[in-house]
Amino acid sequence: VIQRHLDQAHRTISTWAFKLIVLHHLSVGASLSVIRMQDVEAKIMQDIADGASLSDTIQGYSDELIAWSGLTDITYGEVARRMKLAVETTDYFAPSLSGLIRPDYDLLKFFDHARLVDNGFAAAWSKEDRTEILDAAHTVLVIHANTGVGDHFQRSLTYHRAGYLKLSNWDQAESVIEKARALPHRLVLFAGSAGAKYIGPAIAHGTGKVVIDVGVQMEKWLP
């Protein structure tokens, strides 16, 4: 296990190196997707490994937290399928680094990827870094449960530069993918639950869009 963790550390692209990769893809109009997974995704997969029925809906959280996480009425089997699809199709995968020292948060027990990224990039990039990325993209589409977040981007950057799609539950994912792929925005910032992470690569593939899973760090990106 220690060797596997060392291998993960050696293969993880740093926050600042990944910023250069993102800027390059924006400059040449190439597609890129990155998804982040945190401790909650590790817990869901561990629940399944411990014997949770794939036909049961997600348990072990309050109804309020499940609703906030966009996982209302999803089964363990469906969320596991969607998480696997997300990792298999994304260009870059940013698992929580907690798994390096805590076995119960070790996402790479369940998923692996050739291109790993430091999970903290979305929070670590400074305001100047974020502005540089937004300026390089010129146009940005925000996908988030809170319409106020979308309104803020559109007021700050104007409606010509910023778009918004609402995503508040996993069963909205397919509709969001279809709409996002048809829109012209070059950069897509999204916050999606374990049941909707796969929208990142699905939106990016073949569109020339750079799609970044910023998750709970979305407020840091407010211009």
Where are these regions (language model features)?
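Short, solvent-exposed amphipathic alpha-helical segments in soluble enzyme
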Residues: 51-52, 154-160, 204-206
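Glycine-rich phosphate-binding loop signature in dinucleotide/nucleotide-binding domains
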Residues: 181-184
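Short Gly/Thr/Asp-enriched flexible loops that form oxyanion-binding sites at enzyme active sites
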Residues: 198-208
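Short, flexible loop segments at boundaries between secondary-structure elements
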Residues: 208-223
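Redox- and metal-dependent alpha/beta enzyme cores, enriched for Fe-S-associated oxidoreductases
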Residues: 133-179
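Glycine-rich anion-binding loop/nest that anchors nucleotide
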Residues: 187-195, 213
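Short glycine-rich, flexible loops that bind phosphorylated cofactors or substrates
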Residues: 102, 196-198
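Electropositive, gly/pro-rich neighborhoods at or near active sites that engage anionic ligands
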Residues: 1-145, 149-153
